[in-house]
Amino acid sequence: MRSEKKNTGLAAGAVLIAILIIIQIGDSYCSELYDKIQSLFLMDLIMNPLNMSLEDATVMINSVAIPFYAISLISPVFRGMVDYLGKKKVLLINLLLYIPGLLLCMTTRKYIVFLIGNSLISLSTSVDIQYIYIASFIDEKKRATVRGILAAAAALSAASVPVIRKVAITGRPYDYARMYGIGIAITAFVAVIVFIFLPWDKKQTTPEKITQLPTCGNKRNSALIYLYIVIFAWGAGTSGIKFYNEPMITMRFKTDYIINRILFIQPLITIIINIASGIMGDRYQGEKQSVQMWLPPLFR
């Protein structure tokens, strides 16, 4: 009887992880589009209509886009809704919010409207409800490993973008819209999978109370200091890699084969890093195991 319950629990955990991987793949694909095909929509939305160079168009759109990034600040509101609506409902709302953003980016011929659509995509990306599922259902001894697997799935999805770009982009005006159409199809598929297979939340009868907040002065929470070091170290490296983005690669090499190859290789490196860091994180004993759950997804 005990072995049957154990096998049932393992099967349920495997199904949950598989669903989370599917969610992460769709999430990563949609979030990577802006960075991976930037030179393509810049050409059709800004360079050709305004007779600008790629350098000037990149500076312009990054400057104009700054106010639109503020919409990502709403993401804590979405996470807070989990306590009232439940994880599955918020996750479905989050997924469905992708579709109008992708649709705007696919159909518009105005870069301002394009940025509005991209801001909706950025908002959906920043919520990351799947990590709440890890904290709620995955054993604490395996959380970092699962988190590493999801990060690797995200990197693999990011690596698929230049592959799809090579097939879908033909050089015609606005053909980047196909990439967003694929994003709509992927998001709809993920939403159906979540709706059918992910269990609905049970009502919580006894609210949990926070008895003590982690501080650096508390020796039992000394992992928080380690967390700060890791965030700053990885943040510096991530910023450097993000700075070397698709428009800069395009300006440097100007060859589709080399551009797609670089965009493909970068995420593959993060797959190794994320899986290794997750496995090593679970080998630590004590409270250092929780550090991995505090880390935001890398190389989004």
Describe the predicted segments one by one:
Residues 117-152:
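Cytoplasmic helix-loop-helix junction between adjacent transmembrane helices
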Residues 25, 112-126, 232:
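Hydrophobic core of transmembrane alpha-helices in multi-pass small-molecule transporters
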Residues 144-166:
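Glycine-rich segments within core transmembrane alpha-helices of 12-TM secondary carriers
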Residues 2-13, 200-229:
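Juxtamembrane intracellular "pre-TM" segments in multi-pass secondary transporters
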Residues 62-80, 264-276:
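Central cavity-lining transmembrane alpha-helices of secondary-active solute carriers
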Residues 36-58, 243-259:
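Short amphipathic helix-loop junctions that connect adjacent transmembrane helices
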Residues 73-106:
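Conserved MFS/SLC helix-loop-helix module at the cytosolic interface between two early adjacent transmembrane helices
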Residues 84-95, 283-296:
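Cytoplasmic membrane-interface "Motif A"-like loop-to-helix N-cap segments
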